[in-house]
Structures are given as structure tokens and as C-alpha cells.
Amino acid sequence: MSFLTVNRLASKLLNSKNATYFLVAARNASASTTNLKDVLADLIPKEQNRIKNFKQQYGKTNIGQITVDMVYGGMRGMKGLVYETSVLDPDEGIRFRGYSIPECQKLLPKAAGGQEPLPEGLFWLLVTGQVPTEEQVNWVSKEWAKRAALPSHVVTMLDNFPTNLHPMSQFSAAVTALNSESSFARAYSEGVHKSKYWEFAYEDSMDLIAKLPCIAAKIYRNLYREGSSIGAIDSGLDWSHNFTNMLGYSDAQFTELMRLYLTIHSDHEGGNVSAHTSHLVGSALSDPYLAFSAAMNGLAGPLHGLANQEVLVWLTALQKELGGEVSDEKMRDYIWNTLKSGRVVPGYGHAVLRKTDPRYSCQREFAMKHLPNDPMFKLVAQLYKIVPDVLLEQGKAKNPWPNVDAHSGVLLQYYGMTEMNYYTVLFGVSRALGVLSQLVWSRALGFPLERPKSMSTDGLMSLVGAKSG
């Protein structure tokens, strides 16, 4: 539930101008301050007070029912988390602090000569609810550049991993090892007051986001570029540009793609595995390094972070079997054969969305602009015309439309990043922007240890009056 969702609910229940105070403050706050921590320090007390008043008046209000199917079905659709930074609308897709992806593409600052939003701007938006100025985004870029250096023990660790260790395992382990630098862990051990927790969560989150491209690039170079140096951070470049430089890519279009990729993969509400994991682990007052590392272990699971690889494998198999130019009729037959074999068409459908994922749409627009004649893009575009109709005809899919994973791998392949095992690391670098923004707010709002009630099957049967035999 985003702060906009909470605000609408509060406005409806309280019928008071005070309920919209935080939203108005966020939208109209002075743009003169470039220090993100100072902006947060101003916003937090207001939001604390707003939620306190809301809970006092409506804390016992019922907001939904829980069914047996929900309990057995992965808690799908169950309202059980407060998550401020983004909300997923089944029809409109993700909204970052109330802004759709097209709105973010239009409103967020861009690099000189660029057309895609800078992830630094999205991070500012996620943290504050405010669309940042160019000066504020530049401040974030320079701040991350200043914090980017890796401690020597993490570098040594990365350089000594076996080459058969999966990139995500290396990524998660390196993030965990950064825990040695945690301001939050140190402050907690020294007895800091809980009202100050957010300050140290903020410092750790800023440090971690700054260092992630260095970790990710080092993994890439070690595995796929014979251990060549990632080079030095350039404080005059934005976060994405430094990342692509360290990866070894100099194409300006690839840097633009990375800006788009890191923006649109950053957050997707709070119930997905990586976001929920970071929230859960963080609720134990584990520091941001430990919470994010746990989230990355969840992202590494095939049901969460490996979907774009599965899309590419399926597309490659399609090409191998049918050849280069594929007729619509042959493609329909191939799709039906996939479905009749008990498999799914990877990249299509979504647990929540009921229309084309706007993250797919903006990648499609990027491809139409920069690589309209690429054979793989043409194949993806052809599938977009055919797959939804086949899925509707089959009658099983609640959502026959493509999601973000149907397109991202094709774009990366076009610019030369063909190492599919690495793609989830890029996803992880991006997802840090969302889950760490929320982690700071979770500590600021004093969210408690997450501890839902579990039940046995016998207990559930007894609860609903069913026979256990």
C-alpha cells in the first residue's frame, strides 16, 4: 500500500484536510534543498503524526477477509503489508509514489542529451514523494560516486570466488560482506535511540546503492572479461553511466538503455519475494546490507528473477526450430504446442496485472526507436500480435498480455550483453532503489517485527468446521 493509497483511504475516512497534509507537503516542498537526508528529516515527523492519528481513529477497522485459498495460495491478494514507495494497479501497472512509468519518463530529470529518466531521480521520488530538480539529481549522482569505493576485503573476496559460482551467489555474498561497514549495526550496538534508526538505515542504504555497480561490474569482469579492471568511478558521470563504463560498454545507447532498465525494474509493490524479504528481514532490525542480501537470495529464485532468461531460451528454441522468417500461422502452431505440452509461454501473464505491462511498453518503444530491424525484436513484436489471442482462445490465462520480462533480455542481447546468467544481477542492482527506499521509511515509521500467525491444516479445518478425516 503506497502512501498515496493510504492518503486516499485516510481522506475518505477522516474527511479532513489534515489527511492530505503529507501529500501536499511532498508535492510543494521547497526545491532549494539538495541534501536528501535533510528533506527526509523534514518529511518524517509529519508522516509519523499523520499515521499516528489515522491509527488512533481507525486502527480497529476491518479492511478485508482472508479465505482458506489465500492461506494455501501464497497469501495472494491478502492485504497484509504497508509499503509506501509504489503500488501496482491491475489495469494501469506500477505507480511510483503515484506516478506512472510514462509520467516518470516525462517528468524525471535526464542526462545531458539523453531521453530516459535517471535512476537517481526515481530514487529521490521513491524516498520523498517529490519529483526532483536537476540539481537534486546531480547531488545524488555525486553522493553515490563519493561513496562507491569497495573495502579491500570485499574486492579480495570477489576476486577469489570460483568461476562456477553463480553471479547472483557472488552478488549476495559480497553484499553480506559489506555488513562490516554498517553504520546501522554499529549504532544499534552502541544503544542509539530508536527514533534515530532511520538516519543510519539511510546512510547504509546510500552507501550500498553507491557500491552495487562496482560489485556487479567486478563480478561481470571476473566471469566474462578475464578479470580485467573495472576502472575508476567518474564523479562527473551519473550512476548508470559509471556502471556501463565499469562493465566495459561505451555505446551511448546502451547507457540510455541501462538508465531505463534500472528505473523500471526498481520497485513493484511490497508483496513480491525480494521486496517482502527485505521488509521481513529488516523488521528484525537486521541492517540494510543483511536485509538486501536476503532479498537478493529470493530474487535468485527461478520464479522471481530468472524469467527474462527463460524468455530468451524459449525464443532461441523457436528460432532454431522454425528458422529466421516465421509466418504467423507457424508461430501460432508453435505457441499451441508449447501450451499443449503443459508449459507456459514465458514473458506472458502476471500475478496482478490485467493489461500489457507498461514496463514492457516502454522497452518496446525503446526498441522501435533504436533497433527496429533487429531480428529478435521483430520476433518479440510478432509474438505480441499473436500470443494474447492464443492465450484468450485457450481460456486459462487471467492476463494474456506481456510482462517486463518478455522484452528486457532481447534488448540486452542486442547491445552485446549475451551472458544470460548475469541478467538477474542487473535486476538486483535496480531493485535496491525501491526496497532500500522503503527500508528507510520502515525504520522511520517504527514498523515492528513481522510475526504473522501460522496454522496447521488441522487447525484450519477446525476453524472452519470441516471434518479432518
Swiss-Prot record:
Location of the transit peptide in the chain: 1-30
Protein keywords: Mitochondrion, Transferase, Transit peptide, Tricarboxylic acid cycle
Subcellular location: Mitochondrion matrix
Principal EC category: transferase
GO cellular component: mitochondrial matrix
EC number, as in UniProt: 2.3.3.1
Active site residues of this protein: H304, H350, D405
GO MF terms, alphabetically ordered: citrate (Si)-synthase activity; identical protein binding
Domain of life: Eukaryota
Known pathway: Carbohydrate metabolism; tricarboxylic acid cycle; isocitrate from oxaloacetate: step 1/2
Residues that bind oxaloacetate: R359, R431, R451
GO BP annotation list: carbohydrate metabolic process; citrate metabolic process; tricarboxylic acid cycle
Catalytic activity of the protein: oxaloacetate + acetyl-CoA + H2O = citrate + CoA + H(+)
SUPFAM superfamilies: Citrate synthase (SSF48256)
Miscellaneous section: Citrate synthase is found in nearly all cells capable of oxidative metabolism.
NCBIfam families hit by this protein: cit_synth_euk, PRK09569.1
Subunit structure: Homodimer.
Function statement: Key enzyme of the Krebs tricarboxylic acid cycle which catalyzes the synthesis of citrate from acetyl coenzyme A and oxaloacetate.
Family: Belongs to the citrate synthase family.
Name this protein carries in UniProt: Citrate synthase, mitochondrial
